[in-house]
Amino acid sequence: LFRSTPRVYSQNAPLKLGAERMDVVTRLLKGKRVGLVVNQTSILEKRQIHLLDALVAEGIDVKKVFAPEHGFRGTGDAGEEIKDSRDLKTGIPIISIYGKNKKPSAEQLGDLDVIVFDIQDVGARFYTYISTMHYVMEACAENNKEFIVLDRPNPNDFVDGPIRQKGFESFVGVDPLPILHGLTVGELAWMINKEGWLKSTPDTCRLKIVKMENWKHGDPYWLPVKPSPNLPNDQSIRLYPSLCFFEATNVSVGRGTYYPFQVLGFPDPKYGDFTFTPTSLPGFDTNPLQKDKVCYGRSEE
């Protein structure tokens, strides 16, 4: 499970996430019409309140929410199309930007001055939240909208693996990054902007980053909320960048179990003594590979 005390310390001072620097955030947003790119990870840890609720309580004019893969609440299966809806608590519209539409349209941005991005990444090139960030940055550049990133630590805080080569661009590889890029989302947004990776426009994005306080690269960080349905704990987050490649095969990585991305198996006893059976498991995966078949392999728990 995730650690119950996720906060870390640098030089004996408590970490303060970008979203928790509410004095800075509200100063940037007061008097502006705001859109949010957020999900279930957009929590102010110290107060245990969602960013949307915190901003509404501060009197910020939040017009709409844009939801990435897995949706605003983070409950959708991998690849599941997310539908538009409304937040039950605030009544604010939630617009999906995962599925047919990967970025906000000019019409959807028409009544906004600024977009705020606050989503927890796990540091892997093919984790789609950073792809969503790229496309929202493109939309902001195309429509002259301000884009603000509230920064968070990267739990896989190192660089590893080959760089995505030209000609292999996709939604799980938008930018030419190594498999593990080692950047926070704020640093990555800055790099996308400065390297000219926003291909749909010659313009750069009007980018601002609300940095963390009392954090530096190398500080450990344990996520307090699972970032997506099949990354339920710290071990799965560590193993995901490696085991994810098996998803291009018919080998199960444990989707449909309580330990996804911590096991490997195939329905053949020759592959090992460890067994597991993927099933339809709400909250994890309802239609996993090798569903209802006994898989033999190994555990990395």
Which role does the model predict for each range below?
Residues 2-13:
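Bacterial Sec-dependent N-terminal signal peptides
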Residues 74-78, 148-169:
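Glycine-rich, charge-decorated loop segments at or immediately adjacent to ligand/cofactor-binding or catalytic sites
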